Amino acid sequence: MDRETILNAVKEARKNAKPRNFNQSVDLIVNLKELDFSRPENRIKQNVILPHGRGKESKIAVIAKGDLAAQADEMGLTVIRQEELEELGKNKKNAKKLANENDFFIAQADMMPLVGKTLGPVLGPRGKMPQPVPANANLKPLVERFKKTVSINTRDKPSFKVLAGTEKLNDEELAENIDAILSTVARQYEKGLYHVKNAYTKLTMGPSVPIKE
């Protein structure tokens, strides 16, 4: 799938979507073929840094205490301290809500055993286990990276949907973001994009448009 093919699909998707009074997401849907997803090595679980960013803010939660929690507070991030973490371990409904509301999690390294015990059963299946950092870490570079990052997680299914940006990005930027995602998929397999059965792009309120040669 060359850049021109992707670009044409993006233009078509934008044209077919009805205008809305919010910044619509642009998604990429990929269906894979001739792979046995009961074998873990065929599954994709990868973060992709989009060259033109997500087009909207990433929601990031930091599990920390002391200075690291204070730093996260100053940056306006969601902060989960030890007491709250222990409470979440007892309340699965609230734990699921937290998992669904945030795109990425960062955790102070010495709190990871407690994170695994309390939130592991909720975050693990969603592919959202926290990035561990030392207590004296500078969060800014990691947060800046997460602001441009999306996650591919096929689990045991031969398909995935992932954010490629929003309609506020121009067509060329969206095409480059989609190309970056597809390049990540290609690197996972010896036969590269041969294993892509088909791919589509769409805006939130629009129909799916095939990316075809």
UniProtKB/Swiss-Prot annotation:
- Belongs to which family? Belongs to the universal ribosomal protein uL1 family.
Point out the gene that encodes the protein: rpl1
A Pfam family (short name) is Ribosomal_L1
Can you say what this protein is called?
Large ribosomal subunit protein uL1
InterPro entries the record matches: Ribosomal_uL1, Ribosomal_uL1-like, Ribosomal_uL1/biogenesis, Ribosomal_uL1_3-a/b-sand, Ribosomal_uL1_arc, Ribosomal_uL1_CS
Quaternary structure per UniProt?
Part of the 50S ribosomal subunit.
Question: What biological function has been recorded for the protein in this entry?
Answer: Binds directly to 23S rRNA. Probably involved in E site tRNA release. Protein L1 is also a translational repressor protein, it controls the translation of its operon by binding to its mRNA.
Q: Has keyword Cell membrane? A: no
Q: Which Gene3D superfamilies match?
A: 3.30.190.20, 3.40.50.790
**CDD domains in alphabetical order:** Ribosomal_L1 (cd00403)
Any one Gene Ontology BP term: translation
- What would you give as a GO molecular function for this chain, any one? structural constituent of ribosome
Give the GO cellular component terms, alphabetically.
large ribosomal subunit
Keywords, ordered alphabetically = Repressor, Ribonucleoprotein, Ribosomal protein, RNA-binding, rRNA-binding, Translation regulation, tRNA-binding
Q: What is the superkingdom listed in this entry's lineage? A: Archaea
